[in-house]
């Protein structure tokens, strides 16, 4: 069981596998729960995980087969019950397990009469067959039968334009999707303000990996997808600071505040609260954390005081002086200061 603290909650977020079974060599099933989640979180997590499981998990497939002296994929080969197209479809169904990257070569070379199964494929050391009994072809006569194969690790559907290859090499529309199906359901429980949700997640795989392994890989892919956003604010701050360092404004912030004080003489500045200035939520929160609640509090601060506020940025400074000059003429404040 993995536990993770939930921000703003006294409970811990927990997940566990409540059911796991092997229905066949090519069908694994797993059922997981995640709880407690706040209202709406279960649907968010369920949708994201389902998409990641079905579309982002890598699988290994046979992507190409080469026959000798075969004019097209609809040809028949003497001494073989299946046509070339049927053999290609059987090769497409072979389930492989590996951690290889790039293209690898494999082959089949047998002598009939006999049945050819996945067990007859000669594979590189890093690849193994999940179900060795999967059928490929039936040799009805004592002939030599050889196929050169290409194996590749990828994700999703891989299709190629079909055309006759003079060298007898034919692409196979590979389906690199080890997760066969994903379902999720949500159960709500609790009363009043204590309501929370439980996410149930069901995963079926083709045997090349377990549902638990698939869930781990999908979660890791989602984390990698969101990692750049964790550094976006830091990178943006660095960019703004560098830009303003070399191109300072024509008038300093402190000079503008001094001019505002002179122009607004007689105005009860302690009666104007910063939430009346239409500041952005980010700038407003920075000022509130620094106990700046009124316009008088703000105008009493120097530029250096403001820049020492936690998370306060150069763009916040510019936004403040632009907002003050825009929204603080005498005639615009009469209604607000009439009390």
From Swiss-Prot:
This is DNA-directed RNA polymerase subunit alpha. It catalyses: RNA(n) + a ribonucleoside 5'-triphosphate = RNA(n+1) + diphosphate. Its main location: plastid. Gene3D superfamilies: 5' to 3' exonuclease, C-terminal subdomain, DNA-directed RNA polymerase, insert domain, RNA polymerase, RBP11-like subunit. InterPro entries: DNA-dir_RNA_pol_insert, DNA-dir_RNA_pol_RpoA/D/Rpb3, DNA-dir_RpoA, RBP11-like, RNAP_asu_C, RNApol_insert_sf. HAMAP family: RNApol_bact_RpoA. Residues 1-233 are annotated as: Alpha N-terminal domain (alpha-NTD).
């Amino acid at each position: 069981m993995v536990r993770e603290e939930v921000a703003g909650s006294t409970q811990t977020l927990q997940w566990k596998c409540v059911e796991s079974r092997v229905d066949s060599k090519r069908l694994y099933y797993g059922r997981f729960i995640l709880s407690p989640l706040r209202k709406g979180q279960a649907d968010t997590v369920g949708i994201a995980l389902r998409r990641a499981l079905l579309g982002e998990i890598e699988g290994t497939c046979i992507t190409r087969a080469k026959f000798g002296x075969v004019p097209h994929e609809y040809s028949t080969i003497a001494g073989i019950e299946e046509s070339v197209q049927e053999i290609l479809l059987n090769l497409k169904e072979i389930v492989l397990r590996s951690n290889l990257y790039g293209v690898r070569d494999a082959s089949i070379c047998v002598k009939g009469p006999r049945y050819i199964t996945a067990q007859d494929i000669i594979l590189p050391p890093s690849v193994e067959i999940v179900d060795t009994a999967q059928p490929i072809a039936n040799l009805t006569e004592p002939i030599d039968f050889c196929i050169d194969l290409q194996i590749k690790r990828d994700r999703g559907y891989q299709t190629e334009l079909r055309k006759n290859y003079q060298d007898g090499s034919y692409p196979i529309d590979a389906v690199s999707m080890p997760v066969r199906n994903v379902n999720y359901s949500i159960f709500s429980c609790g009363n009043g303000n204590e309501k929370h949700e439980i996410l149930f997640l069901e995963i079926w795989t083709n045997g090349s990996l377990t549902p638990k392994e698939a869930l781990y890989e999908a979660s890791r892919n989602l984390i990698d997808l969101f990692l750049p956003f964790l550094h976006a604010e830091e990178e943006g701050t660095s960019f703004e600071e560098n830009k303003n360092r070399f191109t300072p404004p024509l008038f300093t912030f402190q000079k503008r505040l001094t001019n505002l004080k002179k122009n607004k003489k007689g105005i009860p500045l302690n009666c104007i609260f910063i939430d009346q200035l239409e500041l952005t939520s980010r700038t407003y929160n920075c000022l509130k954390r620094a106990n700046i609640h009124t316009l008088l509090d703000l105008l009493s601060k120097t530029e250096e005081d403001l820049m020492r506020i936690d998370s306060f940025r150069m763009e916040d400074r510019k936004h403040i002086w632009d907002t003050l000059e825009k929204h603080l003429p005498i005639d615009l404040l009469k209604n607000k200061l009439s009390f």
